[in-house]
Amino acid sequence: MQLSMSFLIGFGTLVLALSARTFDLQGLSCNTDSTPGLIDLEIRRLCHTPTENVISCEVRYLNHTTINLPAVHTSCLKYHCKTYWGFFGSYSADRIINRYTGTVKGCLNNSAPEDPFECNWFYCCSAITTEICRCSITNVTVAVQTFPPFMYCSFADCSTVSQQELESGKAMLSDGSTLTYTPYILQSEVVNKTLNGTILCNSSSKIVSFDEFRRSYSLANGSYQSSSINVTCVNYTSSCRPRLKRRRRDTQQIEYLVHKLRPTLKDAWEDCEILQSLLLGVFGTGIASASQFLRGWLNHPDIIGYIVNGVGVVWQCHRVNVTFMAWNESTYYPPVDYNGRKYFLNDEGRLQTNTPEARPGLKRVMWFGRYFLGTVGSGVKPRRIRYNKTSHDYHLEEFEASLNMTPQTSIASGHETDPINHAYGTQADLLPYTRSSNITSTDTGSGWVHIGLPSFAFLNPLGWLRDLLAWAAWLGGVLYLISLCVSLPASFARRRRLGRWQE
């Protein structure tokens, strides 16, 4: 009995350890090559209380439908190669890859020799220009919807497809490729509904908000009209209490001034214009993580995106189980393993195939559902930090005392024991920790600008030797011609002065 109990306990502990090691960390796998979704971020809805000032409105709007449409995707690229030939067989080549936007029949392979290409008194060379055109034609399925963006593609961004292009049966995408399909005319049905909306009373213009649309609309005489929606609210003033008028003699001078200014300040804050400007300004410039804000605002944890002029550009992702790998390279994002492949987990929880570089020895505190601490180039996996917010209710005096609990000790290490110091110096006055909140950030710390480790991929000794010998032969030939030109006049003068050689 005791043996069986110990076996069960050991087996359960092993299962828990394996499950914790395998499924403890999750990342977002996102296809950003697909068409993103566009959504208007109505920040003013933050000021609306769903249970107060509720009114009934008649709403007339167009329904949205989505259908699948077969199409043919054509992508053509033209490879331009120009090869130069000079003395002693030395050559160089220029390679350019351009998008070809013409017809498939016009995508021809040809070569045009130019001989001589360039020739002057010290150098001659010829050139051959070769253009190779390649096209890939693929049968695909796209989704057509009655609201913009009108077309969704999983293989490219089809946001630029217009209604006219849908009706014509051909569209050119932003990357230069083309789509051909059966012409399609967008049609929408009109829907009439009675919805409960929340009206904002403390505003110069009455604003009604609907949770079904996640939008707010400014009412003019109780109605709002546009090409896609009509809103009519009859009793839009019944739920708003009238403002009380007070006179100067009722209060003191200071109180009267505050009383007169309070409605203006209240309108400014409750209209959320200031809050909207701050939020869109911060998240629209890339200073902070727009994906985190979009997840909280749209109440969807599995999306990424950014904000452009108050419009959220959003991609749908799905969660996958990943595991940390040994951080043995100079990468800013930690390496993770997913299905046997190496990826990098950025600060927004997204799996990437590339990453900015970072200084070896840089310590990073990261949040992936839990706090983790990792060191760049340490060869060790990031470790979890045990942190409980409820146990950190510090009094200020206790908090200050907890910062320096031991005397400062300087551990000096020379270049022989610490190669990082040999490469970068001690860097004692710089912040060793860092965090990044931008999807494109390469900043690796406060006050420290990262320039990256040198890359030695350009080292090619055999190529250098070939070029050196070629130029040495060319220079030797030129010097021989110069010496010949200098010696010939002297030889002719000597022959004229001494005559022919006779025995």
Curated annotation (Swiss-Prot):
Residue spans, topological domain Cytoplasmic: 489-503
Transmembrane in keyword set: yes
Keywords from the UniProt entry: Clathrin-mediated endocytosis of virus by host, Cleavage on pair of basic residues, Fusion of virus membrane with host endosomal membrane, Fusion of virus membrane with host membrane, Glycoprotein, Host cell membrane, Host endoplasmic reticulum, Host membrane, Host-virus interaction, Membrane, Signal, Transmembrane, Transmembrane helix, Viral attachment to host cell, Viral envelope protein, Viral penetration into host cytoplasm, Virion, Virus endocytosis by host, Virus entry into host cell
InterPro entries: BDV_G
Stretch list, region Fusion peptide: 274-315
Glycan-modified residues: N63, N109, N139, N192, N196, N202, N221, N230, N235, N321, N328, N388, N438
Site description Cleavage, residues in chain: R249, D250
Post-translational modification note: Glycosated; Stabilizes it.
Highest taxon listed in the record's lineage: Viruses
Pfam families according to UniProt: BDV_G (PF06208)
Signal peptide location: 1-22
Keyword Acetylation: no
Any single Gene Ontology cellular-component annotation: host cell endoplasmic reticulum membrane
Record GO biological process: clathrin-dependent endocytosis of virus by host cell; fusion of virus membrane with host endosome membrane; virion attachment to host cell
Sequence intervals crossing the membrane: 468-488
Extracellular membrane side: 23-467
Protein purpose: Unprocessed envelope protein p57 is thought to be involved in attachment of the virus to its cell surface receptor. This attachment induces virion internalization predominantly through clathrin-dependent endocytosis. Envelope protein p27 and p29 presumably linked by disulfide bond are the viral type II fusion protein, involved in pH-dependent fusion within early endosomes after internalization of the virion by endocytosis.
Name of the molecule in the record: Envelope glycoprotein p57
Organism of derivation: Borna disease virus 1 (BoDV-1)
